[in-house]
């Protein structure tokens, strides 16, 4: 095993100990739940089955009794994974939700980290799809009644390839609406483009559909792949959001004026904070420039001072180094 030494190892160990032995009343104990699995009592699931075959848990399954039992474990917060609407192969066109091409959806239910509409709730989780946001608001209320606090995901680095908001609030603009796709990078764009190139993913682009998935011009893939040929091991179902960093030209930063993506993402944070949640678990936080977090978090906390921001530790070495500076 390779042992990494740190220049301030003694200081880092002290900081870790301070975190571990903080006063019990200040400890945060998070119970994570994959929302669509909780409450799904189907014992006869089949491989690659759809929602009709395999079922799906609902927000209503988190009853006061169930939440009370979770609270008894000593939990302070519950992290509801997969709340925000994401790409799926389930057909919700009758609810005016545009369908996703199966070639750019992982599995039938889809990945909860391929966000399709930042302003909506996953319809799979609702008993009444038309009332899905109300059902989420009721879930938050029930959770608070039991003394628990609510954390949801904020996925800032990437979105589903077919991102489209059918719940876009008045006064806001959809991602990519004003982009210039003839430019591979522009600080005014929300996405990165491969101009004059069609997406040519290195796997089946039909996946059982009558026609293959088409994207022109191709967009950069979520795991920082800036070409038109992602493969099956890439985050192929997602596209990278542009926070003003030109990765293909030395990572130069263009943060003045404030990038449009920053403004749109702040709107999204404030929207969900207004739903009375208590925190965000920020997916792939290290893939978003720290300058954005320094700009956005104080503005959210100015309105909601108690709200938590918790970063995903995807690269443990980055986390260890950050402890040196606590």
Q: Positions of the model-derived regions?
A:
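N-terminal amphipathic/basic-hydrophobic helices that include classical n-h-c signal peptides
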Residues: 1-18, 326
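Short, acidic/polar
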Residues: 56-70, 257-273
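A structural signal for short, well-ordered beta-strand segments and their strand-loop junctions
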Residues: 77-80, 150-153, 281-283, 310-311
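Aromatic- and acidic-residue-enriched segments that line the glycan-binding/catalytic groove
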Residues: 86-111, 157-233
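Active-site-proximal helices and loops of the catalytic beta/alpha 8
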Residues: 158, 170-174, 180-202, 264-270, ...
């Amino acid at each position: 095993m390779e042992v990494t030494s740190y220049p301030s190892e003694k200081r880092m160990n002290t900081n870790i100990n301070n975190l571990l032995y903080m006063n019990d009343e200040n400890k945060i104990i998070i119970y994570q739940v994959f929302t669509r699995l909780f409450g799904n009592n189907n014992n006869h699931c089949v491989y690659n089955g759809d929602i009709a075959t395999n079922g799906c848990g609902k927000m209503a399954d988190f009853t006061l009794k169930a939440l009370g039992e979770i609270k008894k474990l000593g939990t302070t917060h519950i992290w509801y994974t997969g709340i925000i609407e994401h790409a799926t192969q389930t057909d919700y066109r009758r609810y005016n939700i545009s369908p996703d091409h199966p070639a750019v959806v992982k599995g039938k239910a889809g990945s909860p980290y391929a966000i399709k509409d930042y302003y909506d709730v996953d319809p799979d989780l609702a008993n009444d799809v038309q009332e899905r946001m109300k059902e989420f608001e009721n879930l938050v209320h029930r959770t608070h009644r039991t003394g628990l606090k609510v954390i949801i995901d904020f996925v800032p680095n990437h979105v589903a390839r077919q991102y489209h908001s059918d719940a876009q609030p008045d006064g806001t603009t959809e991602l990519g609406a004003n982009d210039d796709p003839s430019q591979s990078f522009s600080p005014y764009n929300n996405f990165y483009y491969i101009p004059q190139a069609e997406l040519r993913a290195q796997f089946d682009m039909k996946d059982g559909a009558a026609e293959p998935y088409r994207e022109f011009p191709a967009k950069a893939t979520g795991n920082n792949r800036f070409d038109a040929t992602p493969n099956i091991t890439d985050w192929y179902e997602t596209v990278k959001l542009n926070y003003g960093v030109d990765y293909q030209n030395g990572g130069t930063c263009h943060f003045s004026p404030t990038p449009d993506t920053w403004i749109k993402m702040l709107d999204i944070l404030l929207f969900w904070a207004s739903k009375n949640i208590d925190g965000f678990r920020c997916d792939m936080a290290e893939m978003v420039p720290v300058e954005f977090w320094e700009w956005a978090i104080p503005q959210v906390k100015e309105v909601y001072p108690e709200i938590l921001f918790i970063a995903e530790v995807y690269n443990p070495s980055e986390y260890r180094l950050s402890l040196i500076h606590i």
